Amino acid sequence: MLAFKSDFLHIMSERGFIHQISDEKGLDALFSKEVVSAYIGFDPTASSLHAGSLLQIMMLHWLQKTGHRPIALMGGGTGLIGDPSFKDEARPLLTQDDIATNIVSIKKVFANYLTFGEKETDACIINNAEWLCKLNYLEFLRDVGKHFSINRMLSFDSVRLRLEREHSLSFLEFNYMILQAYDFVELYKRYGLRMQMGGSDQWGNIINGIELGHRLGTPQLYAFTSPLLTTSSGAKMGKSLNGAVWLNADMLSPYQFWQYWRNTEDADVTRFLKLYTTLPMDEILKLSALQGTEINEAKKILATEITAMLHGRDLANTAAKTARKTFEEKTFGENLPTIEINASDLKTGAGLLALLVQAGLAKSNSEARRHIQGGGIRVNDQIIEDETCLILEEDINAQGIIKLSFGKKKHVLIKPL
């Protein structure tokens, strides 16, 4: 790989962000001589991004930190269709109101990573519905559609693999690739953007935009993709046994977010410190040298640094403190997830199975029953073997709460009112 002269590409290379770049020398020269505006597209089909998007957000963070302008493109227009890339089935279509509501919610996250304003390197959030929803279809087909070869589009892995598995690809979704390519050209015309970044699964879509720009007379545009990350065990980033690891605090608490990263596999610690934190490389190298049980300290630092960037240093430290009290001091951490129940329910006894489901420690009564049969459920740190167990007033501790646990790392406090 090229020894980059520009700060941005040097950091991207050093920390492991680079999968593929369309023209390394040309892009490095561009970054070295001027402020570059670049963008990443984000899918607004949910009300929050999850941890799988954090790599791209960190790329925008470093872009701005090295003196360039980051743009977060919200797919308000393309989101009405859905990206078919490597999906086996079409997604349910959302309304424009659904998409708009999701975008408002998603925007909150970016303020924790980027500085917004009117300066040359200040970040901006743009919605592609601004131009896509105003397109004249016949004019678009005539002026843009003519530049796309169906034969070539069918050769893209994202499409080919889906067709090989005999999953249909609707004409609606096929248009997504053309619209995304058009986004790149439109963003150059409106904002002077020269580079699009994304995951490696977006390479074909980004190259389409570069080639369309060339045919329509733009200066050279550039593609930059990052690896599609999985954990060492092959799990997708941003997913846990309990579902998506959401970035919005109202969908996943800072403590639960911290705990997700604390549970990082040993083999992933160094890689994640490079990608998801801004710790200096020399400090990361020191942490990566830790062995045995000492690596747990590196995991705590990883979890705290990532949580601090998203939720703030105070909440990150509180999450770390809660974990320490819960796991090391065997006391009740102040920031553990808490649910409230009627105190009167405990007079006759509340069923443990139902409480486990209500607390989110099981998805159903049958799953809660399996947890108990496997010896994984504890009440106030005491293993429960009876699936008909009732939680009573006498189970309330001196702090006025009851602690439910599944395994060693999942705890919920029950607060009777």
UniProtKB/Swiss-Prot annotation:
Nucleotide-binding found in the keyword field: yes
Motif ('HIGH' region): 44-53
Molecular function as annotated in GO: ATP binding; RNA binding; tyrosine-tRNA ligase activity
Reactions accelerated catalytically: tRNA(Tyr) + L-tyrosine + ATP = L-tyrosyl-tRNA(Tyr) + AMP + diphosphate + H(+)
GO biological process, one term: tyrosyl-tRNA aminoacylation
Compartmental location: Cytoplasm
InterPro entries, sorted: aa-tRNA-synth_Ic (IPR002305), Rossmann-like_a/b/a_fold (IPR014729), S4_RNA-bd_sf (IPR036986), SYY-like_C (IPR054608), Tyr-tRNA-ligase (IPR002307), Tyr-tRNA-ligase_bac-type (IPR024088), Tyr-tRNA-ligase_bac_1 (IPR024107)
E.C. designation(s): 6.1.1.1
Main location group: cytoplasm
Binding-site residues for ATP, renumbered to this chain: 239
Keyword terms, alphabetized: Aminoacyl-tRNA synthetase, ATP-binding, Cytoplasm, Ligase, Nucleotide-binding, Protein biosynthesis, RNA-binding
Binding site for L-tyrosine: 39, 176, 180
GO cellular component terms given for this protein: cytosol
Cystine crosslinks: none
Pfam families given in the database record: SYY_C-terminal, tRNA-synt_1b
Ranges for domain S4 RNA-binding: 350-417
Gene3D superfamilies per the UniProt record, alphabetical: HUPs, RNA-binding S4 domain, Tyrosyl-Transfer RNA Synthetase
Family per similarity comment: Belongs to the class-I aminoacyl-tRNA synthetase family. TyrS type 1 subfamily.
Function: Catalyzes the attachment of tyrosine to tRNA(Tyr) in a two-step reaction: tyrosine is first activated by ATP to form Tyr-AMP and then transferred to the acceptor end of tRNA(Tyr).
Subunit structure and binding partners: Homodimer.
Protein name, as recorded: Tyrosine--tRNA ligase
Gene: tyrS
